[in-house]
């Protein structure tokens, strides 16, 4: 009887939620405790995220770019100002030049699509100028912060949408290594700054990538007020 009960409990705990949570935290107790939470495809996609840097030598299906950008534009945006832009790069020669600015990362060359996310105050400045407004608010650091936030929200929607379609991707922070060079290559105006790039493609099934574990929630999650983390948790 006891062994049967143990088996039943084990089967109950062997759920998609439990598997995804264990992969993300490597914490059996935590994963088992949340094994019966409500689950859906959206959560499964989000919690399965991993960076993909190796792709099949295949183009993306027609309409994929536009669908990804529709997902990106569905993200939250500060006061609906939409202070971001994205540049889709598919030309191999341009990708090679951009890769040279970003530590020559091979996946920039290999991916069929490279997206460059831009914190874009230039468009708002242009609108202000056309309407004869001074656009004073654009001179404050707050404007740059919300432009970065808008670009980041859009990018995260993009990668989640891509993964939901069976695609893979990888953020490229090294696109900030040479801001002037990247801006010149992409013909960026003043007040438009690259925040990061993102490669998108069909993952190479022969080269797997693992889900990387994250810090324990007790380090990241603060309830009511900020509290310094337990040093033992940081050491782990």
List the predicted regions and their residue ranges.
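Acidic, surface-exposed loops and disordered segments
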Residues: 1-236
């Amino acid at each position: 009887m006891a062994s049967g009960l143990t088996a039943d409990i084990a089967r109950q705990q062997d759920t998609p939620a439990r598997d995804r949570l264990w992969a993300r935290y490597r914490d059996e107790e935590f994963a088992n405790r949340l094994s019966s939470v409500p689950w859906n495809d959206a959560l499964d996609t989000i919690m399965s995220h991993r960076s993909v840097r190796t792709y099949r030598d295949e183009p993306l299906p027609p309409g994929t770019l536009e669908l990804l950008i529709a997902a990106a534009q569905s993200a939250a945006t500060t006061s609906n100002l939409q202070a971001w832009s994205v540049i889709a790069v598919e030309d191999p020669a341009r990708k090679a030049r951009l890769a040279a600015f970003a530590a020559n990362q091979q996946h920039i060359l290999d991916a069929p699509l490279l997206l460059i996310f831009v914190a874009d105050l230039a468009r708002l400045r242009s609108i202000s100028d056309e309407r004869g407004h001074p656009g004073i608010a654009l001179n404050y650091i707050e404007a740059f912060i919300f432009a970065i936030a808008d670009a980041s929200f859009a990018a995260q929607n993009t990668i989640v949408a891509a993964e939901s379609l069976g695609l893979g991707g990888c953020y490229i922070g090294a696109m900030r290594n040479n801001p002037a060079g990247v801006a010149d290559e992409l013909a960026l105006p003043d007040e438009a700054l690259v925040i990061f790039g993102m490669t998108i493609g069909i993952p190479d099934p022969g080269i797997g990538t693992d889900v990387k574990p994250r810090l324990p929630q007790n380090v990241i999650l603060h309830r009511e007020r900020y509290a310094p983390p337990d040093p033992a948790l940081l050491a782990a």
